Amino acid sequence: MKIDLDLHIHSSFSPDSLVSPGEIIRIAKTRGLDGVAIADHNTVRGGITGLDLNPDPDFIVIPGAEYSTEYGHVVGLFLSEEIDVKGRKPQGHTLSPTLPFEDVVNAIHAQGGIAVLAHPFQSREWLPAHVFNGAVKVDAIEGFNSRAGTRAYPNANSLASRCSSEYGIPALGGSDAHLSWEIGRAYTRIDLGGVSEGDVCLRDSHSLVKEAILAGRVECAGKQTHRAVVPLTELVKAYKRKTYHRMPYFVLKLIVAMLGSVGLRIENAQRERANAKNPPQQQ
């Protein structure tokens, strides 16, 4: 039996999302997903709320949270309680922008959770090997994150997939959705082994899913999200924090992102027309 899960979604418990846990579940089901992981910034409250709200035995909700470390963001999956974050404020905002990598991974493992390195090459091209094979290491990596290519490094997902192969760690897929229309743009296909459909209540199958992920019985796939999601998310954050004076700046960034996309489409269309008029000569 194989199931498709979006393993990285933010709810309204994050400072930069307005989508409630209940709405996430409803949308994910309409898009054919078998489950989701709700992983908010610095808090597991959104995931636990979603877990409590889920009435469907054929749909799984995995509580999680996303933490900032010196080596990037780490998502903890299958969490049951908060990890102590110094300076935590409502909606996951924290006074401490980065936490020690080893402390975060150890705290996730102490709960029986899985530590996933999220969009590792979104803003860098290199990470030390011990993150993947040291005494304290992640269990998996996001091989496809729908937002990863919208920032500094367009090849972020290909670098992550290469890292998965090099170190032999599972590659997971997640949309990193902060907006409702992003849900399901990336997913992880998980092979539950010899389990047959109807033999198991998926809602209560956390241990089966966890076992399959750690065993590497996973595939990731998805589509990249439009780069405009970044300033849109920043607008949501400014609105929720009531820093309204910053909103015009993010509106300008949104316009620039949209114009850049239009310009790229025009350039591609012109290139296609030129190739149609002057097809390459065969040797």
Name what the model sees in each region:
Residues M1-L7, S11, P15, V19-R26, ...:
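Charged catalytic cores and adjacent phosphate/nucleic-acid-binding surfaces used
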Residues I24-R45, G113-V116:
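Divalent metal-dependent hydrolysis catalytic cores, especially in the metallo-beta-lactamase
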Residues G113-E125:
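Aromatic-lined carbohydrate-recognition surfaces of secreted/lumenal glycan-active proteins
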Residues L7, A39, A65, A118, ...:
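Active-site flanking residues adjacent to catalytic metal/cofactor-binding acidic residues
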Residues H41, P120, S146:
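Flexible loop residues that form catalytic
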Residues I62-T69:
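A short, structured active-site edge motif that brings together acidic residues
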Residues V74-I114:
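Binuclear metal-dependent hydrolase catalytic cores centered on His/Asp/Glu-rich metal-binding motifs
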